[in-house]
Amino acid sequence: MCFYYKKDFFEKTLHYIDFKLNKIIEIAKLALRKGCIIRWFEPSSACSKNIIEYGFVSLNSGKIVKIKKLKNCMAFLHALQLTKENKHSLVFEYTKNDIPIIRFSADSNCTCQSVTYNENIIVTAPHHGSSANANVYKSIKGDNIIWVRSDNEYKNNKRPCQEFKDRMNNYCLACCKYNFVSEICFEYNTWHKQWDYISGQRCRCK
């Protein structure tokens, strides 16, 4: 049988696969109901911009155009585990017409090149503003950057890191020792060519 392997590994692997596959299946269902096209990406060690469409650009990944055939069942199980390493998180930028860039950092430490933005852009803080990703704030430069972070807890000593707190324009969905807010809203002002803060919560973490 192809399932001949260490029992603990097999049980843990199946549990992890089941958990992750259910997440993927749910996302796929929601996408199909909305008529969205589903695409698969794989991480790339090289930092290069790959234009996708609809204004999205991938910064550290490439679109999978050909599915690789796996040799055996165990290779299939290993492939399904999906990496837990945050460095493999995919980073995307979105821009359309004259709207400045919105950068989605996920949990990535994407710092292979230093970038300076001259326009008023929005960047999501990588890994909820974790100290493990603190070097990102040195590699992404600009005077008008708006940093936004989400979190599901507000008593984590490692986030947000001091580098996030030191940013001039920073916003939190969950500030330390303060209540959660449901959303942070910005609206693009075409006249002044900038993002206007509408509602939410400025960072009050200390």
Residue ranges and their predicted role:
Residues 18-21, 135-137, 157-161:
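Short, structured coil/loop segments at alpha-helix boundaries
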Residues 1-101, 179-180, 189-206:
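Flexible, acidic/histidine-containing loops and adjacent segments that form or flank the divalent-metal
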